[in-house]
């Protein structure tokens, strides 16, 4: 899954071999990418690199919509990380909250939270935790406000993170 700029037009490239040809994996992946397409189209800024707050919520929305389309899987399935990463984020969410509190409107921690081979600043933090953190924040916001993805897909990230 990669967003590529081609002559001022965004093109999403989806590598279907990563789905192992399984219909539910394809549905999950397409649902995830669809929310990215809708969000970027409606918000009209770079949802991936503008700032870490935007990226958390963008990925959280995408993972949550995947869950709506392919229900009853573990969080690790939607966030595409090992179960141990999900557990680490759940056990350390307050630490993450404190670390990112003053960084949400910047993009200098993007690598720490979203890339496979990151050298993270939080001790023992697994890579790609941003997907889980965003997912948990989006799920919490939707639960508290009795909302669905369709209600928040265009919402400003600051609203979801109470900024």
Regions found by a protein language model. Name each.
Residues 28-41, 59, 63:
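Active-site recognition of the HExxH zinc-binding catalytic motif
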Residues 95-163:
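Pan-zinc metallopeptidase signature
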Residues 35, 39-43, 66-74, 138, ...:
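Hydrophobic/aromatic-lined pockets within catalytic cores
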Residues 45-47:
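Membrane-interface helix caps and helix-loop-helix hairpins in membrane proteins
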Residues 20-36, 86-108:
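An acidic intrinsically disordered interaction segment
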Residues 50-87, 91:
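Post-HExxH zinc-binding segment in Zn-dependent metallohydrolases
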Residues 1-23:
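Active-site scaffold of zinc-dependent metalloenzymes
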């Amino acid at each position: 899954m990669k967003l590529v700029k081609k002559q001022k037009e965004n093109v999403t490239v989806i590598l279907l071999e990563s789905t192992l040809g399984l219909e539910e994996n394809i549905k999950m992946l397409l649902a995830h990418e669809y929310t990215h397409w809708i969000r970027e189209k409606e918000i009209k800024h770079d949802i991936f690199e503008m700032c870490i707050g935007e990226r958390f919520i963008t990925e959280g929305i995408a993972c949550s919509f995947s869950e709506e389309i392919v229900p009853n899987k573990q969080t690790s399935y939607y966030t595409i990380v090992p179960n141990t990463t999900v557990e680490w984020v759940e056990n350390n969410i307050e630490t993450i909250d404190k670390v990112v509190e003053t960084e949400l409107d910047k993009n200098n921690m993007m690598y720490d939270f979203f890339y496979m081979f990151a050298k993270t600043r939080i001790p023992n933090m697994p890579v790609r935790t941003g997907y889980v953190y965003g997912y948990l924040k989006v799920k919490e916001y939707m639960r508290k406000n009795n909302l669905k993805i369709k209600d928040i897909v265009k919402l400003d990230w600051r609203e979801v993170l109470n900024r």
